[in-house]
């Protein structure tokens, strides 16, 4: 969910040949999309190509829509100051209505041909089951607090709680 929108995460997934679909803050100050050149519409599906760099040359500064400066303090594993000076990131920004006056913005590298906006909405909606499961695991089952200090015992607690969660889900499926 929100909070995962970093160029470093996008690049790691892209380098592994995998796909991502990440919700981002919807426009304005403090949002990743606030600096993008996006359509002036409520809903859109816009292809983006950014060239990330740690260099602040005249060319980079003159083309802020093409280049994105990454500060040295921001982690990005595919750039350095000497050998790898530029990294190209390709993705889509998809914005769609979730209610009459509320919108969600998604950044994804899923192919547009296979995943039009309606499919993106469906995939985005699928995450709710996963999110509610994590909430149950953290709070109802107690996965946010451990009693052990050693790694192997913490792992044992995690597995025990996962088994308990799955057992509880199995029981509730047959009762309800």
Q: Model-found features: residue ranges?
A:
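Single, function-defining residue in the core of a domain
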Residues: 2-176
């Amino acid at each position: 969910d929100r909070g995962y929108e970093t160029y470093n995460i996008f690049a790691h997934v892209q380098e592994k040949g995998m796909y991502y679909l990440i919700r981002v803050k919807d426009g304005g100050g403090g949002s990743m999309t606030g600096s993008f050149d996006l359509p002036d519409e409520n809903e859109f599906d816009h292809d983006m190509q950014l060239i990330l760099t740690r260099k602040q040359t005249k060319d980079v500064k003159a083309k802020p829509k093409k280049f994105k400066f990454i500060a040295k303090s921001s982690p990005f594993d595919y750039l350095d100051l000497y050998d790898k000076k530029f990294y190209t990131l390709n993705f889509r920004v998809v914005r769609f209505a979730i209610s009459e006056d509320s919108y969600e913005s998604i950044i994804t590298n899923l192919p547009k041909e296979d995943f039009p906006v309606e499919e993106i909405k469906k995939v985005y909606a699928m995450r709710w089951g996963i999110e509610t499961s994590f909430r149950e695991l953290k709070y109802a089952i107690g996965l946010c607090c451990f009693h052990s200090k050693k790694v192997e015992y913490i792992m044992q607690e995690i597995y025990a709680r996962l088994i308990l969660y799955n057992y509880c889900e199995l029981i509730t499926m047959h009762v309800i």
